[in-house]
Amino acid sequence: MGISFSIPFDPCVNKVSQWLDMKVSYTHNLEKNLVALETTMEELKAKRDDLLRKLKREEDRGLQTLGEIKVWLNRVETIESRVNDLLNARNAELQRLCLCGFCSKSLTTSYRYGKSVFLKLREVEKLERRVFEVISDQASTSEVEEQQLQPTIVGQETMLDNAWNHLMEDGVGIMGLYGMGGVGKTTLLTQINNKFSKYMCGFDSVIWVVVSKEVNVENILDEIAQKVHISGEKWDTKYKYQKGVYLYNFLRKMRFVLFLDDIWEKVNLVEIGVPFPTIKNKCKVVFTTRSLDVCTSMGVEKPMEVQCLADNDAYDLFQKKVGQITLGSDPEIRELSRVVAKKCCGLPLALNVVSETMSCKRTVQEWRHAIYVLNSYAAKFSGMDDKILPLLKYSYDSLKGEDVKMCLLYCALFPEDAKIRKENLIEYWICEEIIDGSEGIDKAENQGYEIIGSLVRASLLMEEVELDGANIVCLHDVVREMALWIASDLGKQNEAFIVRASVGLREILKVENWNVVRRMSLMKNNIAHLDGRLDCMELTTLLLQSTHLEKISSEFFNSMPKLAVLDLSGNYYLSELPNGISELVSLQYLNLSSTGIRHLPKGLQELKKLIHLYLERTSQLGSMVGISCLHNLKVLKLSGSSYAWDLDTVKELEALEHLEVLTTTIDDCTLGTDQFLSSHRLMSCIRFLKISNNSNRNRNSSRISLPVTMDRLQEFTIEHCHTSEIKMGRICSFSSLIEVNLSNCRRLRELTFLMFAPNLKRLHVVSSNQLEDIINKEKAHDGEKSGIVPFPKLNELHLYNLRELKNIYWSPLPFPCLEKINVMGCPNLKKLPLDSKSGKHGGNGLIITHREMEWITRVEWEDEATKTRFLANRSSFSSSLICFSNDLVSRDMNCFHL
């Protein structure tokens, strides 16, 4: 009898069957799943893009993205990359399948791929089904670290608004605030930082870092990490490079604002783990610095200068600090307070320190004493040597090179608020050997301009351009006090650097120890006589210009063996120098311009080192005998001198083998004029040339012939001449010519030589009654054939009282730099060489000024577009520009003695 039994196989078989079905479905349904994955991913990306657009609108309203939205967006970004990888492998994987997907050439590989596609499809579907009722909320202020802030600086409100609006522009990723020390850069940066506590504007984090003078990358990394809540042993044990990479990857997922206060050199954002701000990531970096060079190196397109306060704003800040009790304690104190405030020159740091000191001074005498101290030696004023000057000295210390530092200190030799010509400064520096002039004057001057540029960009000098085109610099009064303080060894050796300029001195001041004096400036005083002997064994510079000097004793210069620079210019009653000047064996610079000097001093030939001699505007000079003995002379300036040139003078000057720069005024009718103009040696040196005829005598020759060697000529003036032609050499070039002035040249008919002056910036032509063409077409044939386009750098064109002038040029010119055309008294000038594209465009675009409305209405324009451009705003500027034109005529008349 057998035993029978049964095993329940059905459940097991079902499970195995389901498992096999699922495995097979990964490959069997692969193509269908891939299509679904691609479609669903496209829908997810569209949903993501819609959400991002909504978020942009919300962020612009000052709202902040919710955390769950950020998480969802990060997941979409991650899964998009993985889906792309799967879809990129699609063709290869489908080719492996056979038997309608029930089998594969590589079953394991196809199974894994099919499973990945299936699972990724489920993830994408889940993300795509997500619905968000709310995507943003009011921005949290917890990520903004408010900085302690002194009361807002009076007058900086507009600057704050401008800075904020500029920073919020989409195209601005990095903004630099620059300016001199103590001007309020950090205060302004703090105000911008604290403004984010009210308006986050969609930023996730606002980070503030103070950068030390010596950049420490690791310290900055740690500080930024702390601000974004990265800390712990894992961070601390990372190397500097690892910290940078980690922080970079962390910050690139955020929208941040980074404030870097007080940087002195370029900060490499990559090194400190900061992604560079772009339009795409919408991050911002804002920094303060004293150097414009730093702004440039950081990639700032439009640096914002933080300037000193205007007078009214400065006084408002000053009186607010002093307080009404003190100001009201005596009626005179309020008036004196304006004088004291003005001494601070709008510098907030100085205004704060000085006002705090004066807030308890309630007698008129105390205020008068304060003014005296600030005028005589401000470093002694309370708070100056410990709160103001040391802070400014950081800028001085950061200058690269002792020569640059010395050049800054030299600027302090001039009076307060002095406008200093750049060329004068550079000449002093060369002759003091601060700048090496051994390789030529041009190279030394270029170095001088580079130094001035570096001082301007370091916010230590201020740059201006005068109406006559002169380039000048100014020294802020507080910076000047700092320079004097440094030059006197921080106040320990006041007699080493004596500056008593423009203080009303009537005699040489008393000095305890003349042997320590290195530089002395007594310019612009009332010292009629220099008597006795000064034992100044270390003196290298002595500036005595414009001191009403009449006489110098014979022994005055006997003990100045190191004197290199002596400026006696502007002393109109000084008619001779003592023979003792021969004792100045180290003298390299002697300026006798605008003096009453009649002849060169007898001892001049002993000055073997003299390289600069200035005799400009010497109306009494009758002899230059002996000048050929100055074998090392490189620069001789005679412009405006009434000295009558002759053949002997030409020969003497030609004997100066080292001469590089010459400026002069010559009479059109003197015997030596033609010889001078034909001297290739002298013409190769000429930098300024003025030809005039004030005697009304007729010249033997009717033309002036210019040689081909005038490549140094920068300014050319012709006055009251009977010349009918300015003739050029065949291959003539005036490559350095910047300014040309012609007046009362009544026989001149054209100025075609100007075609060969590619760098000409200013052209004034006045009262030349027979002038018909500026550039004559027939005579310009060779230049036109060579492809020369005239006036590529012309900035100003002034044409006055030219009755016969018909043409400037016969066809439209680009004039890419032209800003002004002033026309008056030119009735026959019926067409201007302009088209609608000519001249500068934009804010400083070309304008045409005139006095006669009848003339401008008769002008024949190139086309309607040209007419529209230059006449569109005529009514808005004609009356004011008529006045401006009159001013120019007045200036020109003074210049040309009309």
Swiss-Prot record:
Record-level Gene Ontology MF annotations: ADP binding; ATP binding
BP GO terms, sorted: defense response
Domain called NB-ARC: residue spans: 137-440
The keyword Nucleotide-binding appears for this protein: yes
Coiled coil location: 24-88
Keyword Coiled coil: yes
Pfam families: LRR_14 (PF23598), NB-ARC (PF00931), WH_DRP (PF23559)
Swiss-Prot/TrEMBL keywords: ATP-binding, Coiled coil, Leucine-rich repeat, Nucleotide-binding, Plant defense, Repeat
Signal peptide coordinates: none
Annotated ATP binding sites: 179-186
InterPro entries: Apaf_helical (IPR042197), LRR_dom_sf (IPR032675), LRR_R13L4/SHOC2-like (IPR055414), NB-ARC (IPR002182), P-loop_NTPase (IPR027417), Plant_NBS-LRR (IPR050905), WH-like_DNA-bd_sf (IPR036388)
LRR repeats: 516-537, 538-559, 562-584, 586-608, 609-631, 632-654
Entry similarity comment: Belongs to the disease resistance NB-LRR family.
Summary of the function given for this chain in its UniProt record: Potential disease resistance protein.
Comment, domains: The LRR repeats probably act as specificity determinant of pathogen recognition.
Protein name per its UniProtKB record: Putative disease resistance protein At1g63350
